[in-house]
């Protein structure tokens, strides 16, 4: 069903219903205008907006410049009936295009449902419409009626391309941000759109981005509709809350104030400019405003000015605000419902998300100050369709977004070149002491009268330099921790899957009816929306500098197109002072070739050689092994843009190696993270439960603190670093285009010197030349993008994250002391729990929380680069064993030869997992290239691998050290060996002096983190310092090795159990790496994090969790109990029963029994999963095994209370009961493998995580939404954390 009621024509006669002359609220009397009601609550007025504000009634250009990148004025636009008809059809077509997507249908339904609150009465027990949320509709007989509405689309005012969402009403700013909302007016035109450079973002396809692209006008209208949604629901951010820029330097934009509302509406990583502390402030503010509205509805006893009933209007606002209603009719705000509505309005509805649904190209940031504007006509289907936009299917316009490419689809786009009233703000950058004879003209920004060379730089081409005032820093505030301290739920990233979940649960029914309203005054007088005062900055401000800038270098590459000959030069001075010279950063050989005149007979060969050389110059890259996280360097960026202000441009590669990515930044960001605020722990005398809960809450709040700091750093990085990198990206594209233009001009000049007869013998096409040069530029931009992205991520990871981690580690140390003292002070209350709680505190606070960029941004380009950053650590590996293409191979650049014995076993699920037995034929030999055989006294090196060591079962293993990895020759080298409860690293020099570093673990422990479980081992060796062993990213032991002499290792590495007395012994090993450097702690943690494969769920041992495999269950909150079934059927329940009991062999091991209780089997919900591996967010069923028969885990979601008791049901009896579980992998990177199971109802709504709740001292399994509110990353304390235990030979327990 279409969104627009019917097809309208502007000349259709008025009927007083959906075609009528109307009066809208304004600041004075107005003449009625013809309007069209395209849907309930939504009208379109195909007129220029000269009536909402009399001060804006003049359509001519203003006398002074506006502080915007570009303005366009044409007083004749939209003055004829044909133009108005085309406008009407264009707007309705865009509404249908938006409505055709799932996201658009949700947004438009929200807008129709978003009736402004009836708060127009001065009596608090009375509901009354606010008159400025109404229009007067003129009837055919001349009378009028008043009608409430939500949205009006109006033509633009004087500036045709200034699209905006505005409103009128009493104290209008409060209405749009106090929860009430007010009627919205959008100034918009479907006949104009904006350009952007997509090649700045393209990473892989040189065919994409061959020119300028045009924005789909549906995206532009959707952006304004999102604003309307915020304002109708009264959650718009105060326009005074803006993102400011500094203005004190020549390279910074002046006067730019981007409102938080715009950043939030755009979405993507721009929304991350608003730091989390401020976003939490907004959310809490509007939550309280919604509670005020619920309170007002509860007080209301009557309604006036309408024939609608009070109860009907209450129900309208109940639907709008998703209020809860109890049996007495009292309304309240449910926090979960509010959070869902607020998330939908502010994070689901964004421009960035609409781009994904429209499947179009779009600007990548709101801070896109491209000045290209195009005239378009979207009404004909041959130009634009509802489903495809410009990229028409079954045509050449469908591929590579060619329909939006303004050069390929040039018939659809008319670029506005001669702007009426094109105002630009600029700065004048002058370098002192330059002799200016024969300089370029003053019109180009050069001062001929002074001994200063001045260039004019547009304000919007300068660096975006955010002010420190933008970043809230309340991290130093202390906090009181109690037993009921609120733990914030971890935020869920916005994904297409999440949006689809919102769509599936969205209620599209119950669209509000038209309500009869008593006639208001014939002229509804509104109050103008006051806009914030933007500080104005002087235009043309002059800055006197003593050196050239990036902008001088770019200007030196420009020239005036004409009939005169130009020539390239490698001298910036010469190019700036001589109008016929153009600066190039290409080689002197290229300069000689391009400047050399050629005869006609040689012309085509000359051109072909120049194109080849141009491609060769732009393709230049350098590589270095000195920087692990930057794999390629574009050496000409320095001389192209004067990076480093001339100091480093002649050796840009050397400067980057010496200084790092910081040399790219014009201004170095400062991150002011104070000493983090401490926690004040509240004591509870003689109350064990509340005391333990307080400790748990402190640890969870600690995790929140890490999250806050990481978010704060990412916000600073995006705003302060990434924006600078993006400007360099843009300027490099301009620089390459300048070189192409100069090359073309020289070639074209030479061609025009020939006689007509000579030209006739030359088959030369300037357009073909342009295409070839543009293709070279776009290929070059792929490398430039990769390099700049790597630099940006490198700066984040090496200069910003470590600073935050140091602050957090200091905080952890302080909290650890406070918690241990708290436990000691309350030891009398915590009888039987003291040691367990001390261990929990020590373990939790001695482990850093790894940084994961994907938690904080969803920009795929940056996330891809972050992943590459992690992989680049592997690139320093000189041996990297992986199983690929049915072979075990060395992925390092050395490709070492590998020999595999006949008794080596590769796990069938993950073939990187290699099993070695205590057999002569169970071995792997790696033959190293001579270049990497270790033979040194000083060179550092490291190794890392994962290992799973089965339990030692008998006394034959005591005091039996045996080698598993050996690189010794002539009693010199290194090896890894095992002993009962030990992993041992040995270094030995040629004089047989040795050093050992050991990790020890115990087998006399209830539940071990190490026995038969995958362990990540890293050993680093600094030859002038220590050898260190890390387990799961944590430093365990270190010993000095500076006393060792030359170590000459073997040229092969043998993986084999050598010297083991137990003939049944075996080990598992995977991901072996050898590095020719000492890995630092951050690199070890990054490597650990990457190799943990957090997107795949793991079982108790660390293997991949699988479908259709039986598992015993371990609850991490109460690990001494197991799951049992009271009875099957809907009246039965499952519960935790204990204790587990023990398995033991005297003096060898003493452990809890793991194979106890009811087994769970994970079953596929859909057939899309092909490899039988359970992944994060998989939707599954859980079967439970009772007396060798499988039953389905399910619940009745209509049970009273938050906790829904789970039952084991016959599978055919499940029916409509809730049984779908979403599997969650906790990305804690710890030595345990926590899983969480989120049960959902049949509509996809969360019922809650599966845990347990005490009912009459019985710990029954439940699905509880309490967990969803309380859960926090890395928590080991909540009852919804589980581990799946399969039977495994390495544990040695007989299953019951």
From Swiss-Prot:
Tell me what effect the entry lists for residue 1264 to A.
Reduced toxicity, heavy chain has strongly reduced binding to synaptosomes, heavy chain binds less GT1b
Residue ranges, annotated region (Interaction with host ganglioside GT1b): 1252-1253
Which reaction is recorded as catalysed by this protein?
A: Limited hydrolysis of proteins of the neuroexocytosis apparatus, synaptobrevins, SNAP25 or syntaxin. No detected action on small molecule substrates
For region Belt, the annotated ranges are 492-545
Q: What is the effect of changing residue 1292 to Q?
A: Whole toxin has very strongly reduced toxicity, almost no binding of RBD to neurons
> What does the UniProt entry list as the effect of changing residue 262 to A?
Light chain has 20% cleavage activity on SNAP25, 40% decrease in Zn(2+)
The region called Translocation domain (TD) is annotated at: 449-870
An example GO BP is: proteolysis
Q: Altering residue 953 to R: what's the impact?
A: Whole toxin is non-toxic, almost no binding of RBD to neurons
Its quaternary structure?
Answer: Heterodimer; disulfide-linked heterodimer of a light chain (LC) and heavy chain (HC). Interacts with glycosylated host synaptic vesicle glycoproteins SV2A, SV2B and SV2C which serve as coreceptors. Glycosylation of 'Asn-559' in SV2C contributes a 12-fold increase in affinity to this interaction. Depolarization of target tissue with high levels of K(+) leads to greater levels of receptor exposure. In vitro addition of gangliosides increases SV2-toxin interaction.
* Misc. remarks from the entry: There are seven antigenically distinct forms of botulinum neurotoxin: Types A, B, C, D, E, F, and G; new subtypes are quite frequent. Types A, B and E are the most frequent cause of adult human foodborne botulism; type A is the most severe, while type E has the shortest incubation period.
Q: Where is this motif: Host ganglioside-binding motif?
A: 1264-1267
Q: List the disulfide bonds.
A: 430-454, 1235-1280
Which residues are involved in binding a ganglioside GT1b (d18:1(4E))? 1117, 1203
* Ranges where the record places region N-terminus of receptor binding domain (N-RBD): 871-1092
Its post-translational modification remark reads: In a bacterial culture the precursor chain is initally cleaved on the amino side of Gly-445 and is processed more slowly between Lys-448 and Ala-449 to give the final mature heavy chain sequence.
| Protein name per the record | Botulinum neurotoxin type A
Phenotype when changing residue 1000 to A: Decreased binding of NTNHA by RBD at pH 6.0, none at pH 7.5
Record organism: Clostridium botulinum
* One MF term in the entry's GO annotations: toxin activity
Please, which domain of life does this record's source organism belong to?
Bacteria
